[in-house]
From Swiss-Prot:
One example GO MF annotation: toxin activity
Record-stated family: Belongs to the neurotoxin 03 (Tx2) family. 06 subfamily.
A Gene Ontology term for the protein's cellular component: extracellular region
UniProt protein name: U11-ctenitoxin-Co1a
Comment block on domains: The presence of a 'disulfide through disulfide knot' structurally defines this protein as a knottin.
Cellular localization per UniProt: Secreted
């Protein structure tokens, strides 16, 4: 999954923080 913003729901919606 990809988030709209890496600083928005990244740590709660998907793994785009890595």
């Amino acid at each position: 999954k990809k988030c709209a913003d890496i600083d928005q729901d990244c740590k709660t919606s998907c793994d785009c923080c890595e």
